[in-house]
C-alpha cells in the first residue's frame, strides 16, 4: 500500500480499493435513487431508558433524558457513484503535466528566492504544496540562511507577510521584528499601510502565527489590520471578488480553518484574479477533485460500516454523526495518501462519541461504572455482566479496535494499537469521573475540572489516532514522545476543552448538566458568565500561541507529526464558530461546508 509515499503516482491508484478497511463500490452495487440534498426532517429523539436489570423509580429518576436530532445524511453517500477511470485520468494529467510544470519553476535558477517563496505560498493556498514537500523544504532551508540579505531592502508588506507565513509553517522562526520597518516614529504601524489592501490582508493572516514571545507586535498587527479591513470590505473601490475574499478571512482566518476548506475557497478567488496562472489554477482544481473522489470512497466505506453496526436504532442516545465525524479527519490530513488514516480516525472518533454520549446522557452512575470497569478489563466476556445498551457500546469499541489491530499489525504498527487501547481506557476513566460528580451534585473547582476535562476533550486521543497510519514515522520514538505528555498536546487539550465548553454551555445547562468549564470558572473565581467566557477565550488564544511556539521550537520530532498537531488546533473554529455546537446541531454552516467539499466537484 502506498500510504507512506510523499506523493502519489499512477501506480498507487489501486491501493484505495485493496485494503480491507475500504469498500469497493460500483454503480451496480449502489443504484442511485432519487435523492435530494435537502436535509432530512429533523424530528428530535427524546429517550427515557428502561433496562432489564431494574425498573425502579429511583433508577429511572437518576437517568438523563436525551435530545438529539437524527442524521442529515443517512445513507446518501452509498448512492453516489464514483468512476474509477476518473481517478486514472486526473492522476495521469497531474503526473505528466502539472507536477513537471511546477517543479521546473521551483528549481529554476532564473527565479529568485522571493519569487519561489511567493510561489510556495500560492501552492499552499491552492492545496497542492504537498506534492512538492522535498523541493519546498530544500528551498526554504537555503533561503532562511540568507534571510537577512533577502529582506534587507524589502519594503513591500505583502511580500514580508507571505515570507513570514511560509517560513513559520515550515518551522523556520522568522522574527516578527521584520515588521518593525512598517512602523512610524510613534512605534505604531503606519496609517499609510491602509492603502495597501493586499498587504493588509496578508499581514492579518500572518498575525495569527504569533507565539507568546512575540505577542505584542502580532496582537497589534491583528487589531490594526482587522479594524481597517472591516471598513475596506464595504468599499466600492475594491473588486467584488476581493471584497468577498476579505470577508471570508475576517469570518475565519486561514490558520483557524481546515486546509481543504481554505483551498476550496482560494481556488474560486484565484480564478477571478487578473493574470492568474492557468496551469496552476487547473492543477488546484484537478487536485481538489482527485481528493474529493477519495473522500467519497471513504464515506462509502464508513457509511456501510456504520449502517452494519445499526447503532442509531439500537442506541438513539448516541449522536448519529458518521459524516460529521469523518469531516474533521480532513483537517488532520486531507492528502489522498492518508485514506486509511482518515478511516481509522473516523471509526475511533465515532466509538468515542458513543462512549461519551452513553456516559454523559444516558447511563446512571452505577451503570456507567460497570461499563467503564469492563472497558478497563478489555475483555469481550465482560459484556455478559452489562445491561443491553452497555453491551452494544463495549462490543463496538472492542471489535472496532480489534479490526484496526488486524489491519495495522502486518504493517508493523502494533505499538500504535496498544497506545490506542490505553488512551481509550484513560478516556473512559475520565468520563466516569464526570458521571460521578454529576451523580453526587458536586461542583469542582476550575482546576479540578480541567484536570479531568483535558482528558475528556480527547485531543491526545485524536492526535494518537492520526499517528497510526503515518507509516513513514518510526513508532518507537514517536510514542516515547507522546508518552512524555509534550506541551503541544497539553495546549491542544486545553484549547479544545475551553472552546467546547463555551459552545455547549447552554445545551448542557438546559439538560441540567452543571459541571462544565464555564460554571466551574464562575464558581472558583466568583465572576459572571460573560466574564468567565471572556477569560476562557483569552486562555484559548494563549494556548493556540503555545501550539505555534512548540511547532517552531521542537526539533527532535518529525515535522509531519507536529503539523498534525497544528492542524488539530486549526479545527476548533470550524466546529465552534460564534458559539454554535456544529457537531451536535450540524444543520447550518457545517452542512454547507460538507456539501462544498463532498457534493460539488470544481468545474475544470
Swiss-Prot record:
> What is the protein named?
Terpenoid synthase 30
Q: Where does Mg(2+) 2 bind?
A: 356, 360
Q: Which co-factor is required?
A: Mg(2+); Mn(2+)
Major enzyme class? lyase
Summarize the protein's role.
Involved in terpene biosynthesis in roots. Possesses sesquiterpene (C15) synthase activity and diterpene (C20) synthase activity in vitro.
Give the family this protein belongs to, as stated in its UniProt record: Belongs to the terpene synthase family. Tpsa subfamily.
Motif DDXXD motif positions after renumbering to this chain: 356-360
| Positions of Mg(2+) 1 binding | 356, 360
PANTHER family, per this entry? ALPHA-HUMULENE_(-)-(E)-BETA-CARYOPHYLLENE SYNTHASE, OS04G0344100 PROTEIN-RELATED
Quick one: which pathway?
A: Secondary metabolite biosynthesis; terpenoid biosynthesis
